[in-house]
Amino acid sequence: MVRFESTDSLMLARQLPNKTVALILAGGRGSRLKDLTATRAKPAVHFGGKFRIIDFALSNCLNSGVRRIGVITQYQSHTLVQHIQRGWSFLNEEMNEFVDLLPAQQRLSTEQWYKGTADAVCQNLDIIRRYDAEYIVILAGDHIYKMDYSRMLLDHVEKGAECTVACIPVPISEGSEFGIMEVTADYQITAFYEKPANPPPIPGDPSNALASMGIYIFNADYLFKLLEEDNNTPGSSHDFGKDIIPQLTARKVVWAHPFDLSCVTSNAELPPYWRDVGTLDAYWRANLDLASVTPELDMYDRAWPIRTHMEPLPPAKFVQDRSGSHGMTMNSLVSGGCIVSGSVVVHSVLFPRVRVNSFCTIDSSLLLPDVHVGRSCRLRRCIIDRACHIPEGMVIGENANEDSARFYRSEGGVVLVTRDMLAKLEAK
């Protein structure tokens, strides 16, 4: 491997991605998304009209100059694998660029599935060592954000850290959902608590706690030693947040990296955008954020594009029905292949190939690919899963009791509709 000795920060920031491999943890069940992940891994869930959730981590890697990527898969991986093969096969292996799929294999040495995030990396150490990288970036494949990893790499190297953890302030009321850290003035991590019942606040900011974003940078050789130690530790859950990071605080080798130092935004006045879309309510909100007049996440930034598999689809079409009613949309995202006929779509996201027939009102809803809505339907605060056919005249989102009896209704009042739910309803 070519080694660069330049001490210039700008030059170093450009060189570091070439010495780096990114590992995206994409095997999670995403059980809090309920039936939305019954047939697909959470990173493969559709998002933002035309994307999959994993496209954000993959695009961040490419835009940051990290073009050697391993995607670690396990649960319901077919859809995810298919998406990566179709949409991310353009990298040039001759230039040492790749997206490598690393499925759980139940190797002879373990004969077990991945037991935790650290074990998922550990079981692939033989492959990862062959990448011959100096730095390993470990990413969650199920978050929505834009980040320049080269800036975090530079911070990691300049501080002389063995490990660096990206962090972001979160409301103290939500702190128990994250790994929470305590840091010194220069962001050395002195304590780390995985999903604590009583998260410690940020000093001087009692309303917020400092949360891990699930983004780690390790010196490669140090990571390999840590994983081997953890693999031989009785009682370990083999998880980065629960086991690896907490023990590093005592060794004083781990630093935090504030997200606002590497967040990519086209509007400096907006706060750094990072969303964990782990619940139906959070997933619904994050999608509809993009349909607002001035969304916090700029998907139109040509300097930091989010790439995905591009299907050969015709443009969206809005037509009038035979009675002369026009198809109309307001504050919505409408993807290729959609047809809206004589209906009104308000503050919603229509994914590819959605068909909305006449006399319908679609309000604050997500219609995933290939959804067909019959005539005279009213849908409000809904997530309609892929390929659902909503019968003519159906009303969803206006009666909480009816919605709960027929479909799944979240704590925030968002109604999830799947093909299985519709089939059971039809069979009654």
From Swiss-Prot:
Pathway linked to the protein: Glycan biosynthesis; glycogen biosynthesis
Keywords annotated in UniProt: ATP-binding, Carbohydrate metabolism, Glycogen biosynthesis, Glycogen metabolism, Nucleotide-binding, Nucleotidyltransferase, Transferase
EC number of this enzyme: 2.7.7.27
GO biological process: glycogen biosynthetic process
InterPro entries in UniProt: ADP-Glc_PPase (IPR011831), ADP_Glu_pyroP_CS (IPR005836), GlgC_bac (IPR023049), GlmU/GlgC-like_hexapep (IPR056818), NTP_transferase_dom (IPR005835), Nucleotide-diphossugar_trans (IPR029044), Trimer_LpxA-like_sf (IPR011004)
Domain of life: Bacteria
A GO molecular-function descriptor: glucose-1-phosphate adenylyltransferase activity
Pfam family, one: Hexapep_GlmU
Catalytic activity: alpha-D-glucose 1-phosphate + ATP + H(+) = ADP-alpha-D-glucose + diphosphate
Positions contributing to alpha-D-glucose 1-phosphate binding: Y114, G179, E194, K195, S212
Transmembrane parts of this sequence: none
Known function: Involved in the biosynthesis of ADP-glucose, a building block required for the elongation reactions to produce glycogen. Catalyzes the reaction between ATP and alpha-D-glucose 1-phosphate (G1P) to produce pyrophosphate and ADP-Glc.
Family membership noted in the UniProt record: Belongs to the bacterial/plant glucose-1-phosphate adenylyltransferase family.
Subunit record text: Homotetramer.
Protein name as it appears in the record: Glucose-1-phosphate adenylyltransferase
Taxonomic lineage from the root: Bacteria, Pseudomonadati, Pseudomonadota, Gammaproteobacteria, Enterobacterales
